[in-house]
Amino acid sequence: MAEGPSLHPKLQVDSNIPIEISSQIPQEPARNLAFQMRQSPLVTPGSTTKSSLSVPERNLLKQESEGPSRQSGCMPLSDKYVNKQTSPMASRKFRKERTVYTKEEQGLLQKHFDECSTQTRRKLWSWHYQLVLQRGRLRYGSRTTELSTGR
């Protein structure tokens, strides 16, 4: 039998361990994700399964079923973080409403935008030019030329 590319010794997998297929994992709500990750889903046919939850994990599951307690220090999620809709459309984000402007409003906004952007460009150019004058030279690619001030 031909072997595939060799892995680093720490990354090699024992060939006797069955490979987990994602379709074998039941799809449950996200709150049980920690349980899914720690549960041993590798089961051979005919063998019985035993939950491999540690004591802190059992306590966590017990607290979830009983509700929040003062000892746990956990705060329940507020309604704004809990998505109560269960349909697939619940997670879809909708576009914000567009603001419709009249021709006059559009003209005013465009004029304001043009003035602001022109002023910004002028300020940037002025700042850049002042910097060039202070340094006394201009840079073109890899060559530097001295700025003649005409004095």
UniProtKB/Swiss-Prot annotation:
UniProt superkingdom: Eukaryota
**What tissues express this gene product?**
Specifically expressed in oocytes and early embryos.
For bias type Polar residues, the affected ranges are 37-54
Q: Where is this region: Disordered?
A: 1-97
What is the deletion mutant like? Female mice lacking maternally transcribed Obox1, Obox2, Obox5, Obox7 as well as zygotically expressed Obox3 and Obox4 are infertile: embryos arrest at two-four cell stage due to impaired zygotic genome activation (ZGA).
| Role noted for this protein | In contrast to other Obox family proteins, displays a truncated homeobox domain and does not bind DNA.
Assigned protein family: Belongs to the paired homeobox family. Obox subfamily.
Q: What is this protein called?
A: Inactive oocyte-specific homeobox protein 2
Organism of this sequence: Mus musculus (Mouse)
